[in-house]
Structure formats: structure tokens, C-alpha cells
């Protein structure tokens, strides 16, 4: 829950108002100066229109260097960030030959599989030699290798479902699967903070879409009751099917889904449950099986389980796990399965090897150690940030921890200063978040050592003081006083 301080809200609104006013003034003078110039686009409607275009030109370009920074190494605990410069006020960014070695607090490398691994990497290289980088075909033609079949069986066993289906891209897994599951005459009830892939999938399905308050099962029940009572628009016939969509860990909030309560509501009103575990599978739970394991939920109670291989497994692609009937149905009608090139064989092998490490089937206990390490690292880092006075969103055990920035001027200030001190962080602003709720999103990895985390905390604390984002310093001062008293005693 975001606790936006009143003064911070006012200063943030004032800052955006100032940027908007100066941007409009610059646009006014530009129109005057360009009035006499000829244009070869006369008569064409402008491609970019509205406030989105204005935001891009007058706000985003000012801080463009804080986003999309190229890297020149594997996204391990430390990586090389390519230095860039601009000679035209950030309109164009040029790469240099220089790199800066930085602590990586931005990648989704939760279990550390993104870098070279003693078990995974040799097998990936061998699969590259045997199968090449691409199948150059779709699954229903010549793109179905035995690796794909093995991974589908392994994923189903890992998450506790009868069957699974693979996709070459995590985003497409949601945006293509949802329209294949529900269409006209159906009802989708979605959490208000669900990922954009879910939003686009729901919009493209043709189903009626309703939203419930973030992570609020009570409001979910209200929406369900209201929609069931009213039925379909205009005809008021009963809904053909109802699907409730939630995430395991919300990627911009770091919060765990209230899954047991959501399932109880869905069972009560005979609605299907769709769980997106992109950020939770492999990252939470004693054996890495996601929020179901962490919260004590039987996977059989979740109708459709979605996940990606881009976070905990160091690869690409995604999966859907469900009953055999649902998976067979998807294999026959889902365009992303029928028409898209199958997942790259080396990427498939990477996931197979990573899951075997997690399960201990590589003959070691490295998987268990990684899971214990990510949990310990996440809880330590979150606790220390809160003690320092930062406003940190999310729950314990979650490796995603947003630090609230709010003010637009603090987005580039925080990002650039952290980079200058060799700590790479991800800053997130509109449209990925609401306009007033800009944040820095920290992602913790099992590959981070305690020394790495302390280094990151020291830099973030210094930059936080410099930028002024310790919005709850009283808590920090109280904690410091208690610790000082304990030491004296």
C-alpha cells in the first residue's frame, strides 16, 4: 500500500505542472518558427498525437539516458554497463567504447542462472551444436524437438499440473492465451495492477472485462456478485464462463497475491482462476514452486497456471500448465502455438537444466542453497532499506522491492547518481506506473553476496539522502536509537 505523503503529493503535482507548462510554451514557439517552413507531409495526419506524444517529447526525452542502458556482459551480480553521451539534449544517445562495472540491482536473475553455470552452460552449448539456434519452424510442423516435449513434461511435474504447453515469449503467453480461453459472452475479472500482457490479452479476447481493487478479495467478491446478478450486457443472459486473473508477485509492487482468499471466492461463485507466476515461480517457496507452495495452496485449486522462463531460469519464453483437456484445446486453437516459431532449443535446454538443479536432480544441493539464498538476501535487503527510512513496497520473501521516488526530478537524479557510484538500478515511471507513483525497482538475486548487498545499501542510502527520498526518517531515527541503546547496554 502506497503511503503518499501530503507534501510530497503537492510538490510532485507542482513539478509535473511546471514541466507541462514549459513544454506547452516550447511547443507554441516551435509552431511559430516552423510556420514558414515547407513540409513534404502536408495533408498527412500526424502519426503521433495527444498527451502521450507530448509526454515523450517534453518529459521522457529529458531522462531518456536512464532507460534502456546497453550492457556488455551477462546479467550476473556485477555486469558491464556501456557508457553513452548525447550532443543534442538527449534526443540521440551515442554509445562509447567504455564500460562501467556495476552492481546489478535491476535484472530478474533471481536464482543466478543468467550467468555461466557449471551444470547448465555445457548442456546448453551441446544443444546448440546438436539442434542449432532455431528450429526454423512451428511446433505443429518441424519445430517440435524432444527437448520441447521433455520440458513440457518437466514443467507440469514441477508445478504440480497434469500437462503444460510452451511459448517462445513470456508476454505472448498471456496476450495470446487469454483470447484462446475466453471470448464473446465471457467475463474476465482482473486485478487492477495486472501486467500489461494480461490487459492486452483481456482486451483482445472480446470478453467483457471488469477490474477489482488491487489484492482485495472482498472487492473481488462484490464485483463477482454484481456481474453474476446482472449477466451479459444488454441481453442479461448468464455468462458463458468467468475467469479471475491474478499475479503471484506483482512486478511493480513486489506484493504477494492473496491467493487462498481469491481461490475461496472463485470456488464460491464457480469462477475459473488464472494465476500469472512470472515473478514467483522458482523465486519463492521452499522448493521454488511459487506462491502456491509459499502460501499452502494446492495447485489443483488453480485452474490455469502461467509462468515465464525469463526470471528464475535464466532463459526466455513462457508456459501454461493446466489439465490435459485445456492444454490439448490450446494446442489446437492458440495462434501463438500454431503459427509462431517454436522456442529456441538452447533456451529450452537452459530451462530443463535449471529446473533439474532446483530439484536436486543434478546430483548436488545447489538448488536448495540458491532458494535459501534468494530468500535470505531479499528479506535482509528489504529490512535494511526500511530501517533507513525509504518507502519500500512489497512483502517479505519477494525479491522485487520498489523504492518510491514520486517526484519526476528524482527519477534521473537517483538513477544517474547510483550509476556514477557503480550501482545499476531500474527506475520506473509513467506509463508503466501511475503518473504520481514513480519508483526505483530493486531486484535481488541469489548470486548477490552479503558484501554486494551492503555495497548496494551504502550507495542507495547516500543517494537517498542526496536526492531526498527517505520519506519516513522518523522510523529510521527510532530504529537507530534502539540499536544504539542496545549496543550501550
From Swiss-Prot:
Catalysed reaction equations from the record: L-serine + hexadecanoyl-CoA + H(+) = 3-oxosphinganine + CO2 + CoA
Compartment list: Endoplasmic reticulum membrane
EC assignment: 2.3.1.50
Residue numbers bearing the N6-(pyridoxal phosphate)lysine modification: 311
Annotated GO biological process: ceramide biosynthetic process; sphingosine biosynthetic process
GO terms, molecular function: pyridoxal phosphate binding; serine C-palmitoyltransferase activity
UniProt topology in membrane: Single-pass membrane protein
Annotated keywords: Acyltransferase, Endoplasmic reticulum, Lipid metabolism, Membrane, Pyridoxal phosphate, Sphingolipid metabolism, Transferase, Transmembrane, Transmembrane helix
KW Nucleotide-binding (keyword) present: no
Metabolic or biological pathway, per its Swiss-Prot or TrEMBL entry: Lipid metabolism; sphingolipid metabolism
Transmembrane segments: 4-24
Co-factor requirement: pyridoxal 5'-phosphate
Subunit structure: Heterodimer with LCB1. Component of the serine palmitoyltransferase (SPT) complex, composed of LCB1 and LCB2.
Database matches in PANTHER family: CLASS II AMINOTRANSFERASE/8-AMINO-7-OXONONANOATE SYNTHASE, LONG CHAIN BASE BIOSYNTHESIS PROTEIN 2B
Protein name in the entry: Long chain base biosynthesis protein 2d
Amino acid at each position: 500500500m502506497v503511503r503518499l505523503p501530503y507534501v510530497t503529493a503537492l510538490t510532485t503535482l507542482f513539478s509535473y505542472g511546471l514541466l507541462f507548462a514549459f513544454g506547452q510554451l516550447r511547443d507554441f514557439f516551435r509552431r511559430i518558427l516552423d510556420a514558414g517552413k515547407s513540409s513534404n507531409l502536408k495533408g498527412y495526419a500526424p502519426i503521433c498525437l495527444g498527451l502521450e506524444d507530448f509526454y515523450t517529447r517534453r518529459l521522457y526525452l529529458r531522462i531518456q539516458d536512464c532507460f534502456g542502458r546497453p550492457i556488455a556482459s551477462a546479467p550476473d551480480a556485477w555486469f558491464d554497463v556501456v557508457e553513452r553521451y548525447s550532443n543534442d539534449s538527449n534526443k540521440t544517445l551515442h554509445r562509447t567504447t567504455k564500460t562501467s562495472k556495476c552492481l546489478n540491482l535491476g535484472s530478474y536473475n533471481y536464482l543466478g542462472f543468467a550467468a555461466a553455470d557449471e551444470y547448465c552452460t555445457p548442456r546448453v552449448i551441446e544443444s546448440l551444436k546438436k539442434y542449432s539456434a532455431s528450429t526454423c519452424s512451428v511446433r505443429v510442423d518441424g519445430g517440435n524437438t524432444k527437448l520441447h516435449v521433455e520440458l513440457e513434461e518437466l514443467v507440469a511435474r514441477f508445478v504440480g499440473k497434469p500437462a503444460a504447453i510452451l511459448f517462445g515469449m513470456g508476454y505472448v503467453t498471456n496476450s495470446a492465451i487469454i483470447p484462446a480461453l475466453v471470448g464473446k459472452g465471457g467475463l474476465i475479472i482482473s486485478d487492477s495492477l495486472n501486467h500489461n500482457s494480461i490487459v492486452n490479452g483481456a482486451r483482445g479476447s472480446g470478453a467483457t472485462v471488469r477490474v477489482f481493487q488491487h489484492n482485495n478479495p472482498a472487492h473481488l467478491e462484490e464485483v463477482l456478485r454484481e456481474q453474476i446478478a446482472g449477466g451479459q450486457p444488454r441481453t442479461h443472459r448468464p455468462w458463458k464462463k468467468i475467469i479471475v486473473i491474478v499475479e503471484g508477485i506483482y512486478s511493480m509492487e513486489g506484493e504477494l497475491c492473496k491467493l487462498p482468499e481469491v481461490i475461496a471466492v472463485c470456488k464460491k461463485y464457480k469462477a475459473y482462476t488464472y494465476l500469472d507466476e512470472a515473478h514467483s515461480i522458482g523465486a519463492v517457496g521452499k522448493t521454488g514452486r511459487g506462491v502456491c507452495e509459499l502460501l499452502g495452496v494446492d495447485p489443483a485449486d488453480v485452474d490455469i497456471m502461467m509462468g515465464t522462463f525469463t526470471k528464475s531460469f535464466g532463459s526466455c519464453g513462457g508456459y501454461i500448465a493446466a489439465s490435459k483437456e485445456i492444454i490439448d484445446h490450446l494446442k489446437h486453437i492458440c495462434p501463438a502455438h500454431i503459427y509462431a516459431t517454436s522456442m529456441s532449443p538452447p533456451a529450452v535446454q537452459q530451462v530443463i537444466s535449471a529446473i533439474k538443479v532446483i530439484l536436486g536432480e543434478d546430483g548436488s544441493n545447489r538448488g536448495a542453497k540458491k532458494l535459501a539464498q534468494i530468500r535470505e538476501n531479499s528479506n535482509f535487503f528489504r529490512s535494511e532499506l526500511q530501517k533507513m527510512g525509504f518507502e519500500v513496497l512489497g512483502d517479505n520473501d519477494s525479491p522485487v522491492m520498489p523504492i518510491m521516488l514520486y517526484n519526476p526530478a528524482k527519477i534521473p537524479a537517483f538513477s544517474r547518481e547510483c550509476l556514477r557510484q557503480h550501482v545499476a538500478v531500474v527506475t520506473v515511471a509513467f506509463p508503466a506506473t501511475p503518473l504520481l507513483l514513480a519508483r526505483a525497482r530493486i531486484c535481488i538475486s541469489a548470486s548477490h553476496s552479503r558484501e554486494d548487498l551492503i555495497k548496494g545499501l551504502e550507495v542507495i542510502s547516500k543517494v537517498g539522502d542526496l536526492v531526498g527520498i527517505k520519506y519516513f526518517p522518523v522510523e529510521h531515527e527510532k530504529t537507530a536509537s534502539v540499536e544504539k541503546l542496545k549496543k550501550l547496554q
